[in-house]
Swiss-Prot record:
Protein task: Catalyzes the isomerization between 2-isopropylmalate and 3-isopropylmalate, via the formation of 2-isopropylmaleate.
Catalytic activity, reaction form: (2R,3S)-3-isopropylmalate = (2S)-2-isopropylmalate
Entry annotated with the keyword Transcription: no
EC numbers, comma separated: 4.2.1.33
Organism classification: Bacteria, Pseudomonadati, Pseudomonadota, Gammaproteobacteria, Enterobacterales
Name of protein: 3-isopropylmalate dehydratase large subunit
The entry's keywords: 4Fe-4S, Amino-acid biosynthesis, Branched-chain amino acid biosynthesis, Iron, Iron-sulfur, Leucine biosynthesis, Lyase, Metal-binding
Provenance organism: Escherichia coli O127:H6 (strain E2348/69 / EPEC)
InterPro entries: 3-IsopropMal_deHydase_lsu (IPR004430), Acnase/IPM_dHydase_lsu_aba_1/3 (IPR015931), Acoase/IPM_deHydtase_lsu_aba (IPR001030), Aconitase_4Fe-4S_BS (IPR018136), Aconitase_4Fe-4S_dom (IPR036008), IPM_dehydratase_rel_enz (IPR050067), IPMI_cat (IPR033941)
Listed CDD domains: IPMI
Family listed: Belongs to the aconitase/IPM isomerase family. LeuC type 1 subfamily.
Binding site for [4Fe-4S] cluster: 347, 407, 410
A single BP term in Gene Ontology: L-leucine biosynthetic process
Length: 466
């Protein structure tokens, strides 16, 4: 029987499946951070259980860390306790930890792929909703809760029901300046923020194949923002070339054997999906969210929509509430909306290609008066690479702040946050009320669009910036 990629990955990992019971899946990789793991380790300790497979478990610090100092005390008592607990737990249970002073420390979903921890064909879990990022490699990756974190630590397995399947095909080639972030925001604009609920999404089509691995990670990172369980891109030569030579990747003949298997990780011809969505890449333009969920998104050259234009009463009410929170009026051009802060970073857009795209816009320009702009590399290696290329100097000269790696202003769990009423052009993945700080107003954009907003002081079409 013809199978989808998701079905192949799922079936290959079923350990046990009794009739009328949820299947038990084997987990190949477990990524751990300081926020969702303390109670899980406490649970192990209380029952006298070890971590079953320490060699398949990797930990880092990212959510709570300061991006201005390596001092563990910098972000307050709760953050300090969580980080100290992670150090203690990893030492006690034999788990590899990339702590604040480790050169590989960074956002968990940047670190995993970078170190070759993430490989095609794997099941990967983490106590973090954006674990879907790793699906870019043709891995089945999804976020789990703290009780599930404990279960995986103890057993290296997890009970998981089968999801429905969705195919999102982006046909044709994207125009210059249109990034993976624009593509995924356009997709969510079409499906809505709940359009993928109950599904695992496979992204395909020429525009997806054309993306680098970093672009594919951006894409899969935001699968969760359309309500999907996970996002997938089938592995190909782009994938294999990215993985080759990385720290934890197979070497020599083992790598060749792995590639031979990875090449089978494609949806079979004739396999059926529960839902199919098709978009045309050439119709896409730079995207900016205007509301309080990622599905409330328009082209940078559009006007703020009028809630009255929505036929669905629920959508209309949601739009009215969003505009009130965002302090926006219907009908005004998006390019006239001024911003206070810019955040370039997060597990969506903090990799080297993202920083290069932002630096290209920043070069030779200055951050607009009254705007604070942060650039936060996703990991130690990304920061080192950017500095080797001189990107830090470009940003600093333009008036951006060049920070240490961490989750930073994506979420209000550290010192980087918005004040009430402040408006931010952000490369992160969520624009919910209060996500970047109580009363903060978040607009999601690509790195180049964020840099353009920083230097102009408002939203601007990067295609017009010469």
């Amino acid at each position: 029987m013809a199978k989808t990629l998701y079905e192949k990955l799922f079936d290959a990992h079923v350990v046990y499946e009794a009739e009328n019971e949820t299947p038990l899946l084997y987990i190949d990789r477990h990524l751990v951070h300081e926020v969702t793991s303390p109670q899980a380790f406490d649970g192990l300790r209380a029952h006298g259980r070890p971590v079953r497979q320490p060699g398949k478990t990797f930990a880092t610090m990212d959510h709570n860390v300061s991006t201005q100092t390596k001092d563990i005390n910098a972000c307050g008592e709760m953050a300090r306790i969580q980080m100290q607990e992670l150090i203690k737990n990893c030492k006690e249970f034999g788990v590899e930890l990339y702590d604040l002073n480790h050169p590989y420390q960074g956002i968990v979903h940047v670190m995993g792929p970078e170190q070759g921890v993430t490989l095609p064909g794997m099941t990967i879990v983490c106590g973090d909703s954006h674990t879907a990022t790793h699906g870019a490699f043709g891995a089945l990756a999804f976020g789990i809760g703290t009780s599930e974190v404990e279960h995986v630590l103890a057993t290296q397995t997890l009970k998981q029901g089968r999801a429905k399947t969705m195919k999102i095909e982006v046909q044709g080639k994207a125009a210059p300046g249109i990034t993976a972030k624009d593509i995924v925001l356009a997709i969510i604009g079409k499906t809505g923020s709940a359009g993928g609920t109950g599904h695992v999404v496979e992204f395909c089509g020429e525009a997806i194949r054309d993306l680098s691995m970093e672009g594919r990670m951006t894409l899969c990172n935001m699968a969760i923002e359309m309500g999907a369980k996970a996002g997938l891109v089938a592995p190909d030569e782009t994938t294999f070339n990215y993985v080759k030579g990385r720290l934890h990747a197979p070497k020599g003949k083992d790598f060749d054997d792995a590639v031979a298997y990875w090449k089978t990780l494609q949806t079979d011809e004739g396999a059926t999906f529960d839902t199919v969505v098709t978009l045309q890449a050439e119709e896409m333009s730079p995207q900016v969210t205007w509301g309080t969920n990622p599905g409330q998104v328009i082209s940078v050259n559009d006007n703020i929509p009028d809630p009255a234009s929505f036929a669905d009463p629920v959508e209309r009410a949601s739009a009215e509430k969003a505009l009130a929170y965002m302090g926006l009026k219907p009908g005004i051009p998006l390019t006239e909306v001024a911003i206070d802060k810019v955040f370039i970073g997060s597990c969506t857009n903090s990799r080297i290609e993202d920083l290069r795209a932002a630096a290209e816009i920043a070069k030779g320009r200055k951050v607009a008066p009254g705007v604070q702009a942060l650039v936060v590399p996703g990991s130690g290696p990304v920061k080192a690479q950017a500095e080797a290329e001189g990107l830090d100097k470009i940003f600093i000269e333009a008036g951006f702040e060049w920070r240490l790696p961490g989750c930073s202003m994506c979420l209000a769990m550290n010192n980087d946050r918005l004040n009430p009423g402040e408006r931010c052009a952000s490369t992160s993945n969520r624009n919910f009320e209060g996500r970047q700080g109580r009363g903060g107003r978040t607009h999601l954009v690509s790195p180049a669009m964020a840099a353009a907003a920083a230097v102009t002081g408002h939203f601007a079409d990067i295609r017009n910036i010469k």
